[in-house]
Each structure stands twice: as structure tokens, then as C-alpha cells.
């Protein structure tokens, strides 16, 4: 039972029946006023709560207590089950019982005291002032794992079959004691992802009609539900974002929260709700451009770039310098912001030229020069922190490259980040056997060349050593995540088999723990992470 501020709810005596005849005098004390000591009650579905009430005429007796709505009707959803005497005369508890129909309701009712005059047969009703009684029944597909539950209902229960076409829907979040929920709100939803879209458990992109705070994160319309289908630990992305958040030279790291997803009444399993990578004051905080920003300082930013070998950005090109694991030389760049419809030819020419000039200088003879070398074009500190996250987490996608982001603000240098998509092969000797004894991303994209500069290498080593005490706390964080996700994992892996990821990897499982139990997979993840902290400093 939830009580709001105590209020005195006074009532008036109502004569329910009068004969109009002269009646015998009855000196029995009567109830003239009653007050209830709560203005709002929540009743869990199928359960009961106690409502304290006080009869001011302490010597009075009464025969019945009921609940009445406006017009004198008794509600079908709930009733008074019994009356319990209090410690003092005139003080009682009305036990109010939910009818167990499994429906939501929110009613204004009054507590009615019924008195009957034995000598005349007249009935008198005294009512309290109105108070609120409500119940929130669990929606279809309800699941209880200790995590917040995200309910998405598409219009007409329409399936989500496309990564391009949005489906209209409503979204509601049932929170926990620690995390506030979200009332039903309109949205659109579509699929997302590259390889991950083709697995049975789908990832989704949500676009709310109105910006909303979710789990304390900044207001925004766009949110992502990562399926973590192939991740037996359910925490690779979660832990990676935690590590990235420790990097003070990365301007922004997406906030995230594990949730359960119920789609059109069906439980879909454990998901990670995460902020989408977008240009925004509270996300990638760079200058927003217009199609008129084509000359001078205005054309210099901001830009959000993605390096991705899938080559599925609308605006993309390959710069010939640098190394990728897919075909050798050259790095694929794509423009994520400005949007393709808003990007002008002058802006594209500028950012392609900036990347080309940066790479030419980096691979030129004078690249170590602190004023006119690569440091003139790159935010070096961000590139160091970015590399450390990928290397500590054993993520080889930096070298592919896949889901690698950079951004450039107006008048600023090219900056690494944010981190994104850390589920494929993260902390796995299966995908990166070299991690047992060495580095994974020693030559990824531009890092092979950067590490040829002793000043860069010294700075990288010093930064790693500075961060090491923080990085050593991550195994404890993994333990916290394991406790948080245990019940979710039980339900999730009863529905989904991560080993099916082999269908997208030549018949071989990707992370190496897909056939393990949840707890064994977490222990393996933690062990490999600890190994990384031992191996990396020996190679710097």
C-alpha cells in the first residue's frame, strides 16, 4: 500500500431511507463522521491492502462497510474483505481485496459505513471523502528477472521485418526499485545491424515521437536495443562501455542498461538498451551543420565518420593509407553526419580532403614533427584512449575496421570515438589467438604508423600505466554484472542458442564460449581480461 500525505477526509451523514412517519426515539450512538487516513492506495493484482479509518463517534456500532463509487455503485474491481479492530476504540482497518481480474484500474471511491436502526428498519450511510485506489496489472508477456522490462507493441501487432522501414508502435518501461520506468509513449521501430540482423534474435532501433529520459540518461528520441545474441555472458557490450567510460580523453561513451524485451506480448529475452551514436549536445557534442556551411571556418565541422568494412554507408570512400584486416591497405570511411540528404558537395570535399591530408602527413617523412606532423591533425590523447579500450577488451574490430568512429568539430582536430559494438570476438582467444601473448591491434588502421613514433609509444605506455588501477577494478564489475544478469540469462538461453552464430562464421562459433554455461562463460571472460592486463604492458 502506498500512502500519500495523511489527510482528514470528512463525511456527511446521509439518510438512505425515510418513512415520513414519527419514529420511536433510538438512543443508540450513531456514526456521524468517518475519516480514512490515506488519500491513495495501490493494490497489487490479486492481493489485498489495509486501509486505516477512524470513526469519530467511538461508542457507535455499525453493521457493514463497503466501497462506493459516484452514484452509489459498488466497484466490480475490488471490495472490503473484512474489518479489523484497531488498538484504540473507534480505530479500524478495512482490508480491501483486489478481485483478481488481471486488469488495470484507477478509481475514486468512498468508504461507506452502514448503520441499521433495529427498531425502525431505517438504514443510514455515512461516507468518507473520496480517495484513489489503483492497480497496475502485469501486461501480457510479463517477466520478472530483476531487470527493467521494455514493452513494445506495434500497431496491429505488425512484425518488424526491415532495417529500412519503420513500424509505428508504443513503448512502455516497467522499472525497478532503483530505476524509474516510463509511461506508454508513441514511437517507431525498425531492425538494425549488419550480421546481427540475420540471427534469430533481432536487434532494434527505436525512434520516440518525443524526447524522453530513460534510466537517468539524457533526453533523446533515438535508442537501440542490442540483442547480444551470440554473447553467452550477456555482458561484453556492458563491460566495454564501462571500460570506455573510464577514459577521460573520450568525449562521450553511450550509456546503457540491461533490460528484458517484450514485443507484442511475447518475451524476446535479455537485451541491452543503449544510447544510439548521434550528433547531439549530450551525445557526440560537435557543431551541428547546415547546408549553408560551405566555406571558411563553417565548413570545417562538425563531422561524424564511421570506418566500416561492410561499406554500407550512403556516403563512403576508401583512403589508400593505413591497414585493414579485410583486404590489406586502405581504410573505408563513411559520413554519418551530416545526413546524406543534408551533406553538400563542398562539405564532402572538405572532409575527404582533411582525411587525405592527415594520412599523407602521417605516412610522410616528417610525420613525427610535433607541430607539422600528425599531431597537427589528430587529437592524440583520444586516439590513445580509444586504442586502449579496444586492446584491453581484445576487440579486433579496430583492425577490420568495423563500427569504428571518429569525429571532427568545427575548427578542431580529428578525434577518436565513441566506442560502439563490442560483442563479436571480444575477449576471445578463438577470434584473436595472438592475444595470449601479444597485442591485437598493433597495426590497426593508422596505429602501426603512429607507434613508429617513440613519443607516441611513450605516451601510450604512460597512459596505460596511469589507467591500470582503474582497469583492475573491472573483474569486480563483471561479478556485479553476473549477479545482475543471472535470472535473465536463465530465461534468455532457454529461448536462444548462441552457438547458432556459427552459421555466419563458416561453421565455427565466434566467441568460443557459446556452448558453455552462463557462469562458466563469465569466468572465462574474466580470466582473459585479467590476462590482457598482464600481457599488454610487456608489449609497449
Language model segments and positions:
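Conserved NTP-binding catalytic cores of kinases and kinase-like/nucleotidyltransferase enzymes
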Residues: 135-239
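Extracellular acidic, Ser/Thr/Pro-rich low-complexity tracts
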Residues: 55-59
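Short, solvent-exposed loop/linker segments at the N-terminal edge
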Residues: 41-47
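Bacterial Sec-dependent N-terminal signal peptides
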Residues: 8, 13-38, 122-140
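Low-complexity "stalk/linker" and mucin-like segments enriched in Ser/Thr/Pro/Ala/Gly
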Residues: 68-91
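Internal "kinase-insert"/substrate-recognition segments embedded within catalytic cores
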Residues: 207-213, 227-229, 249-254, 266-388
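Middle-to-C-terminal accessory/interaction subdomains
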Residues: 158, 195, 199, 333-400, ...
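Extracellular/luminal low-complexity segments enriched in Ser/Thr/Pro
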Residues: 91-102
Amino acid at each position: 500500500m502506498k500512502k500519500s500525505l495523511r489527510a482528514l477526509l470528512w463525511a456527511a451523514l446521509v439518510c438512505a431511507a425515510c418513512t415520513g412517519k414519527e419514529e420511536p426515539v433510538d438512543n443508540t450512538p450513531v456514526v456521524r463522521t468517518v475519516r480514512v487516513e490515506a488519500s491513495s492506495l495501490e493494490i497489487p493484482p490479486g492481493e489485498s491492502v489495509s486501509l486505516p479509518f477512524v470513526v469519530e463517534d467511538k461508542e457507535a456500532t455499525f453493521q457493514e462497510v463497503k466501497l462506493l463509487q459516484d452514484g452509489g455503485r459498488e466497484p466490480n474491481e475490488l471490495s472490503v474483505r473484512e474489518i479489523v479492530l484497531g488498538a484504540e476504540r473507534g480505530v479500524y482497518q478495512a482490508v480491501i481485496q483486489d478481485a483478481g481480474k488481471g486488469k488495470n484500474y484507477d478509481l475514486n471511491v468512498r468508504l461507506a459505513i452502514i448503520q441499521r436502526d433495529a427498531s425502525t428498519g431505517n438504514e443510514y450511510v455515512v461516507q468518507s471523502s473520496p480517495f484513489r485506489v489503483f492497480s497496475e496489472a502485469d501486461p501480457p508477456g510479463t517477466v520478472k528477472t530483476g531487470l527493467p522490462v521494455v514493452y513494445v507493441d506495434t500497431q496491429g501487432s505488425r512484425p518488424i521485418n526491415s532495417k529500412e522501414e519503420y513500424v509505428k508502435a508504443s513503448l512502455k518501461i516497467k522499472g525497478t526499485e532503483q530505476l524509474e520506468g516510463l509511461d506508454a509513449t508513441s514511437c517507431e521501430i525498425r531492425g538494425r545491424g549488419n550480421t546481427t540482423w540475420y540471427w534469430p534474435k533481432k536487434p532494434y532501433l527505436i525512434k520516440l515521437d518525443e524526447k524522453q529520459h530513460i534510466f537517468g540518461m539524457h533526453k533523446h528520441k533515438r535508442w537501440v536495443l542490442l540483442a547480444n545474441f551470440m554473447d553467452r555472458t550477456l555482458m561484453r557490450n556492458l563491460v566495454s562501455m564501462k571500460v570506455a567510460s573510464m577514459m577521460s580523453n573520450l568525449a562521450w561513451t553511450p550509456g546503457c542498461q540491461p533490460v528484458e524485451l517484450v514485443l507484442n506480448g511475447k518475451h524476446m529475452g535479455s537485451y541491452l538498451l543503449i544510447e544510439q551514436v548521434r550528433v547531439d549536445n549530450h551525445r557526440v557534442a560537435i557543431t551541428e551543420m547546415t547546408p549553408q556551411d560551405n566555406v571558411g571556418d563553417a565548413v570545417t565541422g562538425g563531422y561524424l565518420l564511421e570506418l566500416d568494412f561492410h561499406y554500407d554507408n550512403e556516403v563512403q570512400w576508401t583512403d589508400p593509407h593505413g591497414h585493414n584486416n579485410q583486404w590489406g591497405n586502405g581504410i573505408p570511411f563513411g559520413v554519418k553526419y551530416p545526413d546524406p540528404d543534408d551533406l553538400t558537395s563542398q562539405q564532402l570535399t572538405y572532409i575527404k580532403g582533411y582525411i587525405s591530408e592527415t594520412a599523407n602527413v602521417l605516412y610522410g617523412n616528417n610525420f613525427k614533427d610535433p607541430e607539422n606532423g600528425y599531431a597537427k591533425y589528430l587529437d592524440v590523447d583520444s586516439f590513445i584512449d580509444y586504442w586502449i579500450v579496444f586492446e584491453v577488451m581484445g576487440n579486433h574490430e579496430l583492425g577490420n575496421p568495423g563500427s569504428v568512429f571518429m569525429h571532427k568539430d568545427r575548427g578542431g582536430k580529428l578525434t577518436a570515438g565513441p566506442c560502439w559494438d563490442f560483442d563479436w570476438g571480444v575477449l576471445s582467444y578463438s577470434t584473436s589467438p595472438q592475444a595470449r601473448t601479444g597485442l591485437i591491434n598493433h597495426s590497426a588502421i593508422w596505429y602501426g604508423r603512429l607507434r613508429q613514433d617513440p613519443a607516441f609509444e611513450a605516451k601510450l605506455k604512460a597512459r596505460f600505466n596511469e589507467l591500470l588501477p582503474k582497469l583492475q577494478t573491472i573483474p569486480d564489475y563483471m561479478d556485479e554484472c553476473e549477479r545482475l544478469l543471472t535470472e535473465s540469462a536463465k530465461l534468455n538461453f532457454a529461448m536462444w542458442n548462441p552457438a547458432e552464430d556459427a552459421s555466419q562464421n563458416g561453421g565455427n562459433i565466434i566467441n568460443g564460449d557459446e556452448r558453455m554455461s552462463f557462469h562458466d562463460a563469465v569466468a572465462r571472460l574474466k580470466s582473459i581480461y585479467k590476462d590482457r592486463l598482464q600481457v599488454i604492458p610487456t608489449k609497449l
